[in-house]
Amino acid sequence: MTSAQLTNRITLLVLWIVATACVSSHAAEVVYVDQSGGQSFSRQQMETAAGFYGLGQNAVVAGNKRDIVTTLKAVRDVKTIAVIIAADALPTLNEEQLLSALRRNGTRSVPLLIAGITERTDPRLLRRWSAGAINGCKEMPVEKGTGSYAIDMGNEVAQPLGGYKLPLNQSEARYLMLESTRGGQWIMAAVSNGTQGPVFVRTTVGGQEVFFSTANTPVNIPITPDPYRELAVFSSLAPQLMFLRYAAGEHAWHSSGKFANLTIDDLWLREPYGHVDYAGLLREMQLHNFHTTLAFIPWNFDRSEPAMVSLLRAHPERYSICVHGNNHDHQEFGPYETHPRARQVNDIRQGIARMERFSQLTQIPYDAVMVFPHSISPAPTLADLKHYNYLATANSLNVPSGSVAPSDTEFALRTATMAFSTFPSLRRYSAEASIPESQLAIETFLGNPALFYVHQGFFAAGMGSFNAIADTVNRMQPDTQWRSLGYIAKHLYLEKLRDDGNYDVRTYSGTIRLDNVHQQDATFFIEKDEDFALPLTVRVDGQPYPYERSGTRLLLQLPIRAGSGREIAINYDNDLNAAAIDVSRTSLRVNAIRRLSDFRDNVVSKSAFGRWFIRSYHDNEPDWNRTLGSLALLLALGMLALYMRRSGKRSRMVQNESRFVEASANGRTRN
């Protein structure tokens, strides 16, 4: 061992000892000041937003002047990174004392939000706490279906949401009356019937930032797996989420980067495939800065054209491969009544073996990310993907078939969920349909990866068909990293700064690349939801590493030097021997389906009518199957009738011929 290696190991050991000694909670805290200990809606919103960001919560009651000492102590605590005061508590507080308690030596003062303001809130208090910028609060009726929230362009608190609209789901809204000459800046405003009123405002009082938000009424948002539900959920919490993200900064859960990906389903390596020209698409990716993953059907493992193999091998920064089922014989991972789980496990195993063979033949790696054909599988199949060490699954819905969407805000606002078999299931958007830019802005604001998918027919108008979406994403977030699904899965974790200078990490995927991009060495306290249903081993940079089990969480502590990174892999034991699995194509049914699919994509889709038929069939498959079945039956009956008619005609001709022969014979006899 060299002296440099020895020094490095000693440094890591010291970091480990320090980390082990620091096992208490080090989360930053939000102080919530209320008039009473009741569970008001404003408090519920604060708790939901703080929980989303992984922030601790310290609720204090300021019901009378004797509670002021406790309140000020909580505000001065070094862990406090944000203070929220319920408007009802303002009469018992002294603004000079509280604003003084928010100041920090050498750093930014702790931001303050006064929340839950209504038309009953004393205007004199609002003027005092805003240095005259806010004169009061009024109610605005909202006609159903006409209201929205507008986000101001000119502030960093809401970026990149500036200029977009959010749904206003309530039947009424309250807005703040601003004094235009006192410097109050609106961040979010309610808009209805031509009237616009600020609902979230920032002011500055003696150098201290003070935010104000109006109260809104609870609204019932249906619990569904629909990704567009995110708009309504986010809108109901927008001021709290904006304020706490701004106030907490690195102390709040945040992604390791801004990621995006385009996936084209069904493709294999032939040129062209349908409307996809690989070289032409590469030029568009280079000009408009995006990355394309091919969702590759393992059945095609040995059909790749050499020129396309060379193109992909030369451009791994633009092209990548993930797994798309196995045979793709319609919904092969569908309900167990028609697609038994044991058969699905066999498809997973054979799919891996075929992809391994594909990599051997082409020297192109593939990402162990499953895109299910047609729709996502039942939940137990996700456990099987995990068993065989898949990184994640990405589909139009992230809720397995037959399962119910989780009711929590975390599910609605995150791209990935661990609610099913503690395996990461990601949602993605079809770029073949219109995607509201406000939806993409929310994903960027929350740090979610923006995942898109299309089929080859999307490029019927040309290889530049995706450019507008890529340009929009890059404009919203100029440092967006367009990467493969595998890269994104390995960076699918959240981190936040602790008050001891180390970092908490919450990982989704079983394998992650954890980089210390900070200026100092640090210990990373890593946690992952885990049901421990399978035997597992944790490895760091290929070597076994100790971990703890705490309920349904796997915990480990990992020191990392500044500017370096480590790979953490949770490996699940299984009996897979890919080399021993038969990868041949022996099913006549599957072979016929795949050949017909190639014919559909490479011939039928070339015409406008063909593309219409493909879209219509995909959207209305049961109806088309019934229609085609009826047409086939009518055709069969028609052919049968024609056959019988011709058979009857031939029979009559034979009878007539027999009579003619008999008559001729009788005539010869008489002669």
Identify the residue ranges that each predicted region occupies:
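An acidic, glycine-rich "communication" segment
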Residues: 114-193, 506-508, 518-520
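C-terminal domain-boundary segment and adjacent tail
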Residues: 59, 241-256, 280-300, 390-410, ...
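Metal-dependent polysaccharide deacetylase catalytic core of the NodB/CE4 family, i.e.
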Residues: 108, 113-130, 135-141, 289-385, ...
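A glycine-centered loop/beta-turn motif at secondary-structure junctions
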Residues: 29-30, 44-45, 49-52, 80, ...
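Short alpha-beta junction capping motif
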Residues: 32-35, 75-133, 137, 207, ...
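Aromatic-Pro/Gly-enriched surface loop or interdomain linker
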Residues: 24-80, 285, 294
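Catalytic grooves of carbohydrate-active enzymes
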Residues: 247-276, 361-371, 375-379, 388, ...
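Active-site beta->alpha N-cap acidic-glycine motif
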Residues: 228-318, 366-367, 374
